Amino acid sequence: MQHGDRNTPGYREGIMSAVSLRRPSAPKGFALSVHVVTWNVASAAPTVDLSDLLQLNNQDLNLDIYIIGLQEMNFGIISLLSDAAFEDPWSSLFMDMLSPLNFVKISQVRMQGLLLLVFAKYQHLPYIQIISTKSTPTGLYGYWGNKGGVNVCLKLYGYYVSIINCHLPPHMYNNDQRLEHFDRILESLTFEGYDVPNILDHDLILWFGDMNFRIEDFGLLFVQESITRKYYKELWEKDQLFIAKKNDQLLREFQEGPLLFPPTYKFDRHSNNYDTSEKKRKPAWTDRILWRLKRQPSQASPLASSVPTSYFLLTLKNYVSHMAYSISDHKPVTGTFDLELNPLMSVPLITMMPEHLWTMENDMLISYTSTPEFLSSSWDWIGLYKVGMRHINDYVAYVWVGDNQVSYGNNPNQVYINISAIPDTEDQFLLCYYSNNLHSVVGISQPFKIPIRSFLREDTLYEPEPQI
């Protein structure tokens, strides 16, 4: 992964890599829609409507997962102290906007100004396991986190996915340092104790952030004129990342959509004008979204028919900047993907079976079954949530599985929640089983209501269970 020798033979990539070369012959399962956001917010507060950024106004788009990376969040001492006790304002805003749409924040990692958030619709939670969250500081010789990367590694329906949000060194002359930090972040991400410890063997790496690559050779006036005329191709060919990929095999494995939008840096704040200060920095595509798919075998492996056939294909649908957002000197960039996969995990480890009808007047009896391979822990717990929960700790009540068990060892297992913990409301609820060993939700119920018995009629006691 070293970038020292840049004279090795290479070839020039086209606008889009031929994804079809990675397509195996295995049958397709289903598709997930993934929306990736990267934005250097330059210490700005979240005072704007983010509906367009999150594609909330696109009625034709049915998203399953949001992956959001911010750089240069305010990381002063006061901010760090307040974030230790409360959610930071940006995370709170994203949860405010996404939780009513049934997206749950499943992971968050922050290193000073870097923030990485992952949201998923709640029905996917039992099929997503958080493997680890890591931070790699590269500022001040690796001891300061103003530059570097933050990572979430997870298993998605049985596939390994690594997500990296980074902020690389600035300035035209620091290109070699940027590539060195790229390597350093990648080399720091190892996952000992798992069956795929090397990140390069993961099925997907999503890498994005303020990479700070600049446009070489051309002067300021030429770049500005090319942007005005939308002659982006000439500028793209002088982009430092584009040039580096020609001569580096590993970088070539990372794909990117075509840069058909204006350079995203540097703007005067609260405008769409490029830098008019004395420095007059040359515009550049500093904010990027890359991905790398592990090559899959072209034919199905001759394994037992009971073993699911691997199929995992990521297709970019849209790669754009959002010029309307002007609180920062960077414009945000988003990429929307279709992820087709044949699930390697199709049955949740825990299947929740709530009682047919609960009321506010009785303890809540919860039945569940587990798969043979599931290893429970005395620290496992079951949470009761309102539909629209923000994150896994946003429960209204919970019980330790070991403490409140009624029956164990013969499926179904049963636990109860005391009536005093049940909220007096007619909202819809969910039950989630949280595994301490896997640090993830491994079972979730369908939504249900808890009616007040005094308002029930006798003929309602045998109504069908509520549906999603």
Swiss-Prot record:
Example GO molecular function term? inositol bisphosphate phosphatase activity
Question: What is the catalytic activity of this protein?
Answer: 1D-myo-inositol 1,4,5-trisphosphate + H2O = 1D-myo-inositol 1,4-bisphosphate + phosphate; 1,2-dioctanoyl-sn-glycero-3-phospho-(1D-myo-inositol-3,4,5-trisphosphate) + H2O = 1,2-dioctanoyl-sn-glycero-3-phospho-(1D-myo-inositol-3,4-bisphosphate) + phosphate; 1D-myo-inositol 1,3,4,5-tetrakisphosphate + H2O = 1D-myo-inositol 1,3,4-trisphosphate + phosphate; a 1,2-diacyl-sn-glycero-3-phospho-(1D-myo-inositol-4,5-bisphosphate) + H2O = a 1,2-diacyl-sn-glycero-3-phospho-(1D-myo-inositol 4-phosphate) + phosphate
The record's Pfam families line, in alphabetical order, gives:
Exo_endo_phos2, SKICH
Keywords for this entry? Cytoplasm, Endoplasmic reticulum, Hydrolase, Lipid metabolism
Q: Which GO terms describe its biological process?
A: cellular response to cAMP; cellular response to epidermal growth factor stimulus; cellular response to hormone stimulus; cellular response to insulin stimulus; cellular response to tumor necrosis factor; G protein-coupled receptor signaling pathway; glucose homeostasis; in utero embryonic development
**Annotated region (Catalytic), positions in chain:** 34-337
**Purpose:** Inositol 5-phosphatase which acts on inositol 1,4,5-trisphosphate, inositol 1,3,4,5-tetrakisphosphate, phosphatidylinositol 4,5-bisphosphate and phosphatidylinositol 3,4,5-trisphosphate. Has 6-fold higher affinity for phosphatidylinositol 4,5-bisphosphate than for inositol 1,4,5-trisphosphate. Negatively regulates assembly of the actin cytoskeleton. Controls insulin-dependent glucose uptake among inositol 3,4,5-trisphosphate phosphatases; therefore, is the specific regulator for insulin signaling in skeletal muscle.
Indicate the family of this protein. Belongs to the inositol 1,4,5-trisphosphate 5-phosphatase type II family.
User: What is this protein's record name?
Assistant: Inositol polyphosphate 5-phosphatase K
Species of the source? Mus musculus (Mouse)
